[in-house]
Structures are given as structure tokens and as C-alpha cells.
């Protein structure tokens, strides 16, 4: 099995992105699966294009994208990507699309095809907080979540099955210095361990487990 793991460069005035720092520290193999690491730009269009180029080069079985979400306190496993770019801030090249589709005439949304509940349970069993998230936002993270899912759906229809998904991670402790009190953070060591456990769950579970992971609202 080949798993392509992507992480963004810093954005929004930050000097570091925990997603990129995390993928740098992942081992090259987890439970026999080859781990391919890719830095991607926090740029509409170019982020997905760079992933697509690597997919065509490596033909991975899975693409797992990692992104920073400064308001999250745990390892947040996304359930769905939606076909909308509605950017509150510009990307790293100044693009700020508002109410534009990620893919013109594409489906309204894609559910991710990774075993999200198995991932959450595996991470929590490792003493690391984790949960299902039902929104990846409307910035670059959702753009990538949806865009890669669209690529995966097309490849699967062509007889080249590929799964994809997205995980949001918190700020690192050094990033919250000077930010409002109680801004959540997580150590890089814990994030890396959480992502390693997530990948183990992907390798071990071809289909998802049946446990509750929903929310009332």
C-alpha cells in the first residue's frame, strides 16, 4: 500500500504550519505501507494541482491531507468536503474567491472514503483527543478535501481505486503565544503520534467501524 500524506506551508501570518512539521516527522513506512510526503502551497488551485501531479507519478492507494485549524483542540477527522470556495482571508498568492465552486459542475459534496470512525477510535485509544468533524470550512482545507475527493472518484471510476480524506490539527503551543487566552494547542509530538495512529487505522481497516460519532448540532 502507498499512502500520500500532504501538509500545507504556513499561511495567515503564521511562521510555521503544524501540518508541514508533522509530515516531516512521519516515518517512511507504517505497518508495511509506504508513506509519501508532500508539501503543498496554501493556494487555491495550485494546492490540488500539486497533489494531482504526485498522484499521477506515484499512484497511491490513499491520499491523506493534513491542515491547521487554530480553533480545534483535538485531532479532527473530516467527514465531508463541499463544492464551495468562500475565503474569509486571501490565500498565499492573494486569491480570495467568494462563493465559487471548487470544481465547476461538480457534485455538491463528497463524503471522504477513509475509515473516519476507526481513525478516531484508534487515536483516542492512544490517549490523544480526537473527534469527527462535519465541516472542513470553506478555505483551502476544504478546497483540498473536495478537490482530491473529486480526483479519487474519477480514478476509481476508471478502475484505479483511490481513497482520500482530511484531518485538521490544532496550533502548536508556540503559535498561541500572544493569542487570546484559552486558544487551544497541541504538542508536535502528540500530533505526530496521532497522525501515525490515524494511518495505522487506515491500513488496518478497509471499511469503517460502526460506532457513534455524530453530534446533535
Swiss-Prot record:
SUPFAM superfamilies: Pyrrolidone carboxyl peptidase (pyroglutamate aminopeptidase). It is an enzyme of class 3 (hydrolase). GO terms for biological process: proteolysis. Disulfide bonds: none annotated. GO terms for molecular function: pyroglutamyl-peptidase activity. The active site is at residues 78, 141, 168. It is found in: Cytoplasm. The keyword Lipoprotein does not apply. Its EC number is 3.4.19.3. Gene3D superfamilies: Peptidase C15, pyroglutamyl peptidase I-like. Keywords: Cytoplasm, Hydrolase, Protease, Thiol protease. InterPro entries: Peptidase_C15, Peptidase_C15-like, Peptidase_C15-like_sf, PGP-I_bact-type, PGPEP1_Cys_AS, PGPEP1_Glu_AS. It catalyses: Release of an N-terminal pyroglutamyl group from a polypeptide, the second amino acid generally not being Pro. Pfam families: Peptidase_C15. GO terms for cellular component: cytosol. Belongs to the peptidase C15 family. HAMAP family: Pyrrolid_peptidase. NCBIfam families: PRK13197.1 (NF009676), pyro_pdase (TIGR00504). Removes 5-oxoproline from various penultimate amino acid residues except L-proline. Homotetramer. This is Pyrrolidone-carboxylate peptidase. It comes from Treponema denticola (strain ATCC 35405 / DSM 14222 / CIP 103919 / JCM 8153 / KCTC 15104).
Amino acid at each position: 500500500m502507498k499512502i500520500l500524506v500532504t501538509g500545507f506551508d504556513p499561511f495567515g501570518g503564521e511562521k510555521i504550519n503544524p501540518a508541514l512539521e508533522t509530515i516531516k516527522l512521519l516515518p517512511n513506512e507504517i505497518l508495511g505501507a509506504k508513506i509519501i510526503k508532500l508539501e503543498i502551497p496554501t493556494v487555491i488551485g495550485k494546492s490540488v494541482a500539486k497533489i494531482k501531479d504526485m498522484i499521477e507519478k506515484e499512484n497511491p492507494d490513499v491520499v491523506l491531507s493534513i491542515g491547521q485549524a487554530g480553533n480545534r483542540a483535538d485531532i479532527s477527522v473530516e467527514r465531508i468536503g463541499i463544492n464551495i470556495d468562500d475565503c474569509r482571508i486571501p490565500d498565499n498568492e492573494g486569491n480570495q474567491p467568494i462563493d465559487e465552486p471548487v470544481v465547476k459542475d461538480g457534485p455538491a459534496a463528497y463524503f471522504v472514503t477513509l475509515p473516519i470512525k476507526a481513525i478516531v477510535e484508534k487515536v483516542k485509544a492512544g490517549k490523544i483527543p480526537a473527534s469527527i468533524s462535519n465541516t472542513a470550512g470553506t478555505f483551502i482545507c476544504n478546497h483540498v478535501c473536495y478537490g482530491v475527493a473529486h480526483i479519487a472518484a474519477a480514478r476509481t471510476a476508471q478502475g484505479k481505486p483511490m481513497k482520500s480524506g482530511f484531518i485538521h490539527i490544532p496550533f502548536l503551543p508556540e503559535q498561541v503565544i500572544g493569542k487570546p487566552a484559552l486558544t487551544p494547542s497541541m504538542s508536535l509530538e502528540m500530533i505526530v503520534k496521532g497522525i501515525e495512529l490515524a494511518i495505522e487505522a487506515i491500513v488496518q481497516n478497509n471499511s469503517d467501524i460502526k460506532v457513534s460519532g455524530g453530534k446533535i448540532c
